[in-house]
């Protein structure tokens, strides 16, 4: 079997799908994208495609090394996202050829189900509480929400009070009936993170995500030493070599590699195994589409240290398409009691509605994240 063609489709809300075709008619699907940089990743996919045409898709490990080491310059979000989507599609092909789900090819299940959590949007406490109530009606009891607005290096205590007030009202409304993580989104400096985390401790969040940017990872162990709240990060780390440094430094309780950003299934399975050796949990980052989610689930179901799985159903970014709009086998993604079950169909287990993908990709607008500024006019972290 030989690879014959790679086709990319930019889609709403901010996704990109990749179709890899073979000379025997077997097709694999992947989801290579950086939110807001889809065209750049698309160019990288087609550059890497030059290595792949005419090659055997079954040699996933070799093709991964060719894509990663074939160029003198490597790593980073663009290249690793391109590799990630290609890697997903190659695993999809392998599973279809062997008539087995990817988790089966990687050694089989370590669990029967995996807890899912849902994003909750809203800028005011009442909006967040209303969102949680709606999501509880469809079975969720675990959530993630933005922990705060953008903060300067040293900022107003009123912003800290506002963030704490939101969390306090959520805990008062729901008590211990729900769990929630708080995403600082890299918006907070180390000095402000120390203050904010301390103020949030009485409300027992499940975790604090990206308390500072990955570029400031040296603060993770320092912040962790000052709190009992688990610290999570990893969505902006792109290879096992970056994760190696934070694991060795300590401080993180949960790693959050993104299966569409960090080299795909092949790389993230290695990252998961590294994390297990350090007694660190795994919670793959996934605010993206169904192919990315399927890839995450296969890694979750082979990784003993997987703790829960993010998914984008109802997320505020999903303007123009919902999580399963391009999927035929929607029932396979149905959650029971807030848990995902293993995907049982061959490959990734996602049946893509190709006709709709082609139609919706025509004239798809480019998504860009907002550009925020502080009160003084300087650029803020979004």
Swiss-Prot record:
Pfam family, one: MR_MLE_C
Catalytic residues, chain numbering: 185, 285
GO BP term, pick one: amino acid catabolic process
Keywords associated with the record: Lyase, Magnesium, Metal-binding
Positions marked as site (Increases basicity of active site His): 258
Pathway(s) it belongs to: Carbohydrate acid metabolism; D-galactonate degradation; D-glyceraldehyde 3-phosphate and pyruvate from D-galactonate: step 1/3
Residues given in the record as Mg(2+) binding sites: 183, 209, 235
InterPro entries named among the record's database cross-references: DgoD-like, Enolase-like_C_sf, Enolase-like_N, Enolase_C-like, Galactonate_deHydtase, Mandel_Rmase/mucon_lact_enz_CS, Mandelate_racemase_C, Mandelate_racemase_N_dom
Function per UniProt: Catalyzes the dehydration of D-galactonate to 2-keto-3-deoxy-D-galactonate.
UniProt protein name: D-galactonate dehydratase
Organism: Cronobacter sakazakii (strain ATCC BAA-894) (Enterobacter sakazakii)
Organismal lineage: Bacteria, Pseudomonadati, Pseudomonadota, Gammaproteobacteria, Enterobacterales
